[in-house]
Amino acid sequence: MSLIRFQDILRDGIQSLLGTNPSAQEIIDAYPTAHLIGNDSIQTAGGTFFDLFAKKGRNEWEEIEKLITYFKKHGVKQSALIRGDFLFGYDPQPYDVIREMVFEYAKLGINILQSFHGMNDPRALIGVIKAVQEAQSNGYDIIAQGTICIEDNPNITIQKCLEFAVELIDMGHHGFYLKSASGRLDPKFVYILTSNLYDKFPDQNITIHVHSTYGKAPACYIAAAMAATERGRIITMDVQHPALSGSTSQPSMNKMVGLIRNHPDKKINSNAPKLDAGAIKGSMRSLFSLRFRYRDYESSYSSELVGAMHDARAAGGASATLKSIPGLVENLGRLLGRNHEMADWNTIQIAIYKMQSKILKNLGEPTQVTPYAANTTGQAAISLWHQLEGRDLYYTLYPGIINYLVGLHGKIPESIDKALVKKAIKVKNLDRTEEYIISTDRPNAMPLAKEILIQAGVKNPTTRQMLSSVLIGDLDHVLQCYFKTNKPQQAPELPFYAQEPSSDEKKYIARDGKTQIRDIRDAIKAIGGTSVLQEIAERALHLKQLSDNLYIFPLGEESLKDKWYNANILKLSLLLGSISKILENDGFTVLQSLSMQRSWGKNNIHDCIKDSVDKKGAGLYDFVVEALADCKFKINS
């Protein structure tokens, strides 16, 4: 078997790109061939796949069980990302809650818990590993992988990571999970760290997880592969199906196989994972369609925004949580606007991230991963608000930042601004910073949750109901699920052009008495529907990112930039150039075909393509048109 293996990080694709908005059934329906591709494992749970299911009005346990049970039925090794003591929430929990949660997931069929704490504090991981060991002794097939959070950060050094690795293994973790939620990472750092981990821990394998936000993930993965294959060791890379890859998620499994096979070192290119291309293709259209339906939840690309995020070490999507703060976006839009017009969301985000890069040092450079990422960005937004209204940057502190500053979330960096710590201590009415309380030393929470549920009308509360009550903190939601009165969020309505056309029986007939009158819906369906529109949009974005030199290519594979660029140009040319023929083959008359492609009016195929492409980034459609024209000019000349 190949030394280089893949984990399909499905959960994070849905979370990072689509905001955990699709239901479990939508995910399953869109990815029918996941188990056939040949990946070593699939991450099906964890992260926001609990609280956000609930916030969307869904019964979180039904959603989780549906996903895990489906993949278990197909014999898939499954993992879940778990936030140590924080589980799938934003506050540390006592051991009785942790134990019951771990046992529930073990019973469902989760095999690997990738357990992390953003500041690499081992105290916050004690509960999960203890519960996993108890589950193992009860016969469950489950392990806890020890996570080391990494990024370009003065708090994160090779030496500190190695010291933390010793603690992880001593605690009983099995293998290492190198996690970079921000994607701000140096491939050289990855190579040195993985080399040292393999040398110092010869019995432990490594999985690496890097987001694609800043284009550094492929080079970091190859750096880890070099360290592994030089030693004949296994390395697992977190990848996405091509239709869920890129942007703020992870690299495409197809792209990574290409990089591995193209690598000049035989030790690497001979260890490419063997994936089933037919199985990958088998879910391409349905996943692109899912991504199209939930496209409004994806961040829009601009080089200026990415630059601001990069300087802030921002994890993609952290700013989305700001929209839930009453009045914040409206006030920032007003204060940043010009000529009595509100600033758009892109402008607001850029300003927030510029502020974030400014305050990181005062905050002690917290690692940009949950819950620190959302809390840092939340403080940046509030500090920007204060600055624009002439107040001190830290006039008020974001609630999550207060908890971090006083030690309630774990380790506090030495470099933190002591004045901010004093302010947070005062806000919390404390005398000093708090010592982090290990989960086993916290008072049990399940008995109180049970009592509250009984008082609310649940006669015999289940373990799952008690866990939801504690973790989500929304008693009304738990009761609604119990009484089956919860109202799950409905899927977004598609734009008119992407909706199902009228049936033949309902179509009007032209004056000639025989020609069916067809509208834009028929034309879009004929060319491939929303899946083709989304594929065009993703390829357009990829072209722009390559043009902006977003991607860092591994040494010896720099030529792939031109190959990837030209391959996208060719595919886009074929997709766009075949429209007339497709319409003709589908029975459109010449006049109907011309009408559907006219450039002098609205509601034509190219307007629909423009709408799809510009959702990925303002002005992206015009960029693609110019790129295609430039390519034709070069060919003709």
Regions found by a protein language model. Give the residues of each.
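Short, small-residue-enriched loops and turns at beta-alpha junctions
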Residues: 12, 16-17, 50-53, 85-92, ...
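Catalytic alpha/beta core domains of metabolic enzymes, predominantly
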Residues: 181-355, 359-391
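Surface-exposed amphipathic alpha-helices with a cationic face
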Residues: 64-72, 126-140, 194-202, 257, ...
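Hydrophobic faces of well-ordered beta-strands that scaffold small-molecule active sites
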Residues: 5-8, 42-44, 76-83, 113-114, ...
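N-terminal amphipathic alpha-helix/helix-capping segment at the start of soluble metabolic enzymes
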Residues: 1-17
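Terminal or standalone catalytic/regulatory effector modules within metabolic enzymes
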Residues: 11, 35-36, 40-53, 302-637
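Active-site beta->alpha loop and helix N-cap motifs at the rims of alpha/beta catalytic domains
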Residues: 46-131, 135, 143-164
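Conserved, mostly hydrophobic/aromatic
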Residues: 13, 115, 176, 228
